[in-house]
Amino acid sequence: MSEYVEVFRVEAKSLLKNFQKHEKEAVARCERVFGDRQDLSLMNMQHVVAKEYGFDSWNELVKAERWQLAEALIATKNKTLHTPLSVDGRKGAMYPFADGKGTVGLRREREGVDLVNFQRIYANGSTSPYLPLDAMDLSQYDLSKLNVLRADYDDYTLWPVEAAKRPEGFEPAEFLEKRKNPGLGIRALHKQGIDGRNRAAAVIEGFLLCDHLEYHDNLKWYERVDSGEPRHGVSGGELVSALAGKTCGVAPKADIYYFSALQTENKQRTQRYYAQALEKICDLHEERLKEGKSGIDVVCILWGIVSELFQNDDGAAEMQAAVKRAADLGIWVNSGHLDFAGNKLWRESRVRCKADGDLDNPDDYTVMPNQLDMAKFPELVRNTLCFPGGGRTVAGSVRLDAYRFSAPGFSLKPYECGLFVLARSVKPDLTAEEFWRIGLETGDFRDGIGVIVNPRQLVTALRG
């Protein structure tokens, strides 16, 4: 039985309690199903709740898929899922809180904190200019000078009501919605039917909230491959939604195979679990081919695990063997900076669209703040392929219906991988090297930045 059923069961118990107290709302809800009957039991209340959430009966609700129950919760509550649920990273799911009091917990910064001229300092002494504002009450702050591209926030963040206290022209809800667009003409390809349908990609990362409405339809496989140590994180949903989310994704129709794996064990870095995950991905690739489907085109990994920097890690030999097997099967393992001969370090770079820019216009893109200053390395600029890598709206990590604006972003890798999936829709035998070469040939060169990928021209070239 799905863990979400308990949410509906709790609501039915609450309805019975209120009905017995003759509360008007509870009585009215029951009358819509049972008329003026007074001898109603918990079973009857369960039936009422099931009907209200779009099911014909309680039995139908209980037998529904987990994601169908999640979708029913959100659709019926009109995107106000303030339900008593908490994230369980072990199963990529949400469970009822023990006390049944789960709500959206807004945080408020202490008075006097400067949210405009902000620098985040980590325990190791490193700094970040990006400001975390997720689920925070900012209604009393003057944020008129805030750089909206330097802050993370979500659709539960409370902004000042007065426009004068927000950045000029900034409407939070509109901005979040606009930034779901992957950009650079990707949606024009979707309109042509080039959207990843009948293709597949895999992701190896940490925690993933499996049932998020942005990508649950695409998620064909979820498996945890590690020692079972506690885990957390936000990047899994960001990667999947940027790659194959139905509104945020570059390849919104692609199948996704997700493996949750630890990078460390007993405080030591290990590649063992990533290697196991990649071997399983190779097995799934072969199974898809036997079923007459396309194989898995690409594996998206944030960690630069194939780099020489990590060659002495625990499990490195197993990982190298798995990467070779994947390559022999035609699967691109996209991990860290690409390491092609002649340009081993700076072959790719992240760009983002200006706050008031046109997401489909490469002229409105700039290099991300934490990227190499390409103007200082003119010999590399023409060999650097740039992808959108920040300033994007992606799926949130703790609520099934929430979205967040990710300023620093992890979306370079999923953008690359998603575009590779689209490219293979046109040329199924495309290699990573060909993808990169043609991307450089068809992209839009911008001095001091590099070659900004042009998805439409890339696809046109592949069509011949």
Name each model feature, range by range.
Residues 196, 262-351, 403-414:
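Substrate-binding/access-modulating region of protease and related hydrolase catalytic domains
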